[in-house]
Amino acid sequence: MAAGGNVLGSTFEDLRDTIALIDDKDRVGVCFDTCHAFAGGYDLRTPEAFNTTMDDFERIVGVKYLRALHVNDSKAPFSSHRDLHANIGTGFLGLRAFHNIVNEPRFAGLPLVLETPIEVRDADGQLVKDDKGKAQEDKNIWATEIKLLESMVGMDVESEEFLKLEADLARKGKPERDRLWEQNEKKKEKEAAKGAKKGKGKGKKVEDEEESSELSDVESAGGE
């Protein structure tokens, strides 16, 4: 879903059409990946955006096919079509998106699978390295994130507890968000420049065709 373009499964409509081709649907299921969806242009960040996305999923695909969720934040910006997983609350999705998820009745009883990085970072988001300069890893990060997700069930997003969690995690993810934002902006600039160059070439071709047509008309008139 993150890739978009000509990749099958990049939209809810793709999933719907694929499922429609299967005769025996008893074992058909869809896994909803939060990072993939966000990168593919499906917003989850506010209650309104989240409800719109999930209502669209229910209407187009059918919530009966939803079997599991892969729960990841996104290092890359919204609709960037880049599948780059981030730790919960540190990416462009942000902690409120995951508050929406853990409090969504339609997800009750579904398995939520973490696919987040296990690189150790300090409070400012810098990688913690060992004596040899190698980035440290810690699988206990997953246990911490599971507890974080569980703690947000029923939590008030305007409470002091939530706001502190949100701020701390956003701070931790800022270096990676800034880095990926810059990459995304450069990519858009290159694409815009490429499009402008292509447009100029097309305009020149039209001008040449018009000039050629005018010359033909003159020659034709002279011949008469």
Annotate the PLM regions.
Residues 65-67, 108-112:
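A short pocket-lining beta-strand/turn micro-motif at the edge of beta-sheets
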Residues 58, 62, 94, 178-181, ...:
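Glycine-centered helix-coil hinge/cap
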Residues 9-17, 48-55, 82-99, 122-159:
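Short, electropositive alpha-helical surface patch
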Residues 124-224:
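Mixed-charge, low-complexity intrinsically disordered regions
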Residues 111-119:
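Short acidic/histidine-rich active-site segments
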Residues 1-90:
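Acidic/histidine-rich catalytic cores of soluble enzymes
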Residues 28-32, 102, 108-110:
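Glycine/serine-rich loop-strand microenvironments at binding/catalytic pocket rims
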